[in-house]
Regions:
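Active/binding-pocket-proximal capping segment
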Residues: 54, 62-65, 69-70, 379, ...
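Non-catalytic C-terminal accessory modules of carbohydrate-active enzymes
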Residues: 136-162, 184-194, 510-511, 592-731
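Well-ordered alpha-helical segments within folded domains of soluble proteins
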Residues: 351-363, 372-373, 404-416, 479-494, ...
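Active-site acid/base region of carbohydrate-active enzymes
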Residues: 53, 110, 121-127, 131-133, ...
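Active-site-adjacent structural elements in folded domains
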Residues: 30, 81-83, 269-270, 341-346, ...
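Extracellular/oxidizing-compartment recognition motifs
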Residues: 3-345, 353-354, 370-371, 387-398, ...
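Extracellular polysaccharide-recognition and catalytic grooves
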Residues: 526-630
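Conserved, charged catalytic cores of large soluble enzymes
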Residues: 3-7, 66, 484-500
Length: 731
């Protein structure tokens, strides 16, 4: 049965936003609302938003299992609310709604409530009320951590109908509302996804202890202890340690990831975990424990958007398996209402540049469709309505001076949601935004060439190939990268126009694309299949962005092969260039060269990261510590995870796919691998590709779900179409 939420601001009146004016102390706040319920209630709906984050209780029972809720947005554009069904929680007569609000991305905790029983408004936030008081959380910050004093936490009886008014009984007041429109949260909630035990403890010379969880992840810790009242235990979080074993927080860029718990002195023991912060870490330095840590003193809790795994990949090569696990852990660590760049330092933003390299890998591993729909709307809200300019992050925290086509992940991610998940309505909704973005880029060109090259380019190649005092590639011209991506965005928008039946726009975009390709070829082609700089990135961007004339594609691909072999099969590319390098070499039949690179622990590469202790992807190809750009949990170099599925297993949607109803199966039987097995829970059903060497031949078994068909391609053989079922081929 369909039910609409509160769709218009008028539906919320007379409910208002309440909080406390003035400077915020950093403390979390409790809010209490008492209301009367009849003996019989057929339908109960609580509409609730708390910024930055909230948790709610009715008669002492927690509503839902979401944490760090709601997801961040640009509060001047949208404010998300949750809807709760209170069935089974209400009692006849007086009831208590309790809300716990922390700063989150809004910083100042504010709440808005509307409760309806059988369609009648029975509780709301009023200009003066409800009663409010401080919780035991004395300080909470996304970046800085949380400080909790258990001695100051109010007795929970105030959450019960028989309990007292929330001490100290002070009423909050009406607060100027955020300008954004109230919208129901349609994105997966952030939840506690799993628990991790401490792998080992290290005692430092000064008596502090360092816990090693053996895995870098995003979340927080649960602390268990028995201690006298006033005992203060601090938890300091980091991704790596100093030579003396203490944690190193230099890469957090100035913020101290510190949780502090002050015990109330309960002889039966105390258990605590934070409510309104999270960290990216592997190591925790613990100070103030009254004794030696026990087996359950500290437990790691993995926290993130609840996007279930939908891809599984396995080979007989343990290094490749570990690389895929590293990629998956990194992606899982960076889903927090938006796809973030990192979970640990003072950033944690939805960078469009990162998503340009990451989005296919992400949706092969996790069902991120709903999360990415929300994020694409965040981008649309951040886009300049007059110029079509798209900023680097969404929700927007940083607007560059230049137009940069790396932000065309806005278009590509939407198109991939169509190919992978059958998304149609969003393409229609955002099509005007894509057109505006293409116009914006065109206006920044000189004769279809983006001469200023944008801000980012091919970001963070190996250090020796970076430009002077920059993380951009010094091997490939910025304007080549920017113009190729501009053309790619126009080509995708033309495909969307064709799918939507927008014939006039399709024709106009096709003409624009032809002009870009001609200008690109005239500006950067040097003859004999060579492009300016003759670098891996130059060839890869030209090929994968569709800038190479069809009659030259084979020759240019051969030049890329020669370049890569001359570079001893070591990459010289940045985040996007690496993705395109993997694809371009595989498309011309040289997946063997990519396998040679991936199956290595030498620098630069993913195996090198693992050989140097990584459990999640680094931001740089180098092992870096200290301040600066050196996150150790950063998904933008993870495109190899998509390559495993697309080329080793050979599972990839066709250009005319609509939710994987049509796809290609074209595995690469590379020498040195004896078995590859991958499955993907597609929108159409489960797809499996499993090949294994047996007695000098390759036995390949693949499964096509119902109502789908696959084009099966093998080297040296004409493509054939297969329908649903499990099929076996021996090569």
């Amino acid at each position: 049965r369909f039910e609409a939420g509160l769709l218009d601001e008028r539906d919320w009146r007379p409910s208002v936003w309440v909080g406390f004016p003035g400077a915020w102390s950093g403390a979390a706040r409790y809010y209490q609302a008492r209301f009367t319920a009849p003996a019989q209630v057929a339908k109960s709906r609580l509409y609730l938003s708390g910024l930055g984050w909230f948790e709610a209780f009715v008669n002492g029972k927690r509503l839902g299992d979401a944490v760090l809720d709601p997801a961040p947005t640009d509060y001047s554009q949208s404010v998300l609310y949750r809807v709760f069904d209170l069935a089974g929680l209400l009692v006849p007569g007086e009831n208590v709604l309790a809300i716990h609000a922390g700063g989150g991305w809004h910083v100042q905790p504010i709440v808005r409530v509307q409760l309806e029983l059988d369609g009648e408004l029975v509780a709301k936030t009023r200009p003066f009320g409800p009663p409010s008081g401080p919780s035991g959380i004395r300080r909470n910050s996304i970046y800085g951590g949380e400080e909790f004093d258990a001695r100051l936490e109010p007795d929970s009886t105030w959450m019960l109908p028989s309990g007292p008014i929330l001490p100290p009984g002070r009423s909050c007041c009406r607060i100027a509302p955020p300008a954004g429109r109230m919208r129901a949260a349609m994105t997966p909630a952030v939840r506690e996804l799993m628990e991790l035990p401490v792998r080992s403890w290290n005692r430092l010379a000064d008596g502090r202890f360092v816990a090693d969880f053996g895995q870098n992840f995003a979340g927080y810790c649960r602390l268990k202890l028995t201690a006298p009242a006033g005992t203060q235990v601090s938890l300091r979080f980091a991704e790596y340690c100093n030579a003396d074993g203490s944690v190193n927080q230099e890469n957090l860029l100035g913020e101290e990831a510190l949780d502090v718990y002050t015990a109330r002195g309960d002889a039966a023991g105390e258990v605590w975990k934070p409510r309104f912060t999270y960290h990216g870490f592997r190591f925790v330095e613990v100070a103030g424990l009254p004794g030696e840590p026990g087996a359950d003193t500290l437990t790691g809790i993995v926290v993130g958007s609840d996007c279930p795994p939908i891809g599984r990949f396995r080979t007989d090569n343990e290094l490749l398996n570990r690389i895929d696990a590293m990629v998956a852990w990194t992606e899982r660590s960076n889903l927090h209402g938006v796809p973030t760049d990192c979970p640990q330092r003072t950033e944690r933003m939805g960078w469009l540049n990162d998503m340009m390299a990451r989005n296919e890998c992400a949706i092969f591993h996790f069902d991120e469709a709903t999360l990415l729909r929300k994020w694409l709307r965040d981008i649309a809200e951040a886009q300049d309505p007059e110029t079509g300019f798209v900023p680097m992050t969404a929700p927007n925290h940083w607007t560059p001076d230049k137009v940069d086509p790396v932000c065309s992940s806005f278009v590509e991610t939407a198109w991939n949601l169509h190919l992978f998940f059958g998304e149609r309505a969003l393409l229609r909704e955002l099509f005007p935004n894509f057109l505006a973005w293409c116009r914006c880029m065109e206006q920044a060109t000189e004769n279809q060439i983006l001469t200023d090259g944008g801000e980012i380019g091919d970001w963070v190649p190996p250090l020796e190939f970076c430009g002077r005092n920059t993380c951009r590639s010094g091997l490939v011209p910025q304007e080549l990268v920017a113009t190729a991506l501009y053309g790619y965005a126009v080509s995708l928008t033309a495909k969307i126009a064709a799918f939507l039946g927008e014939k006039d726009e399709e024709k106009r975009l096709a003409d624009q694309l032809a002009a870009i390709r001609a200008a690109f070829h005239a500006r950067f082609y040097r003859g004999e299949g060579k492009y300016e700089s003759e670098s891996q990135s130059a060839y890869s961007f030209a090929l994968r962005c569709g800038m190479v004339p069809e009659e030259l594609a084979g020759l240019v691909s051969q030049r890329l092969v020669e370049r890569f072999e001359a570079d001893k099969c070591k990459l010289t590319t940045g985040n996007i260039g690496t993705k395109y390098l993997l694809e371009a070499l595989s498309e011309c039949g040289r997946a063997d060269l990519i396998f040679k690179m991936v199956n290595s622990t030498e620098y630069p590469g993913w195996g090198y990261m693992l050989a140097n202790g990584a459990t999640t992807l680094w931001e740089r190809w180098e092992l870096a510590t200290g301040g600066g750009m050196n996150s150790h949990n950063h998904p933008m170099l993870g495109s190899v995870g998509g390559w495993f599925y697309r080329y080793l297993a050979g599972i990839r949607p066709l250009p005319d796919s609509d939710g994987f109803d049509r796809f290609e199966l074209a595995p690469s039987f590379v020498a040195g691998l004896n078995e590859v097995e991958a499955s993907y829970d597609s929108f159409a059903g489960k797809i499996v590709s499993h090949w294994k060497r047996e007695a000098g031949k390759v036995a390949w078994e693949f499964t096509i779900p119902a109502n789908s068909k696959a084009r099966v391609s093998l080297p040296g053989d004409a493509a054939r179409t297969f329908g649903p079922g499990t099929h076996r081929i021996t090569v």
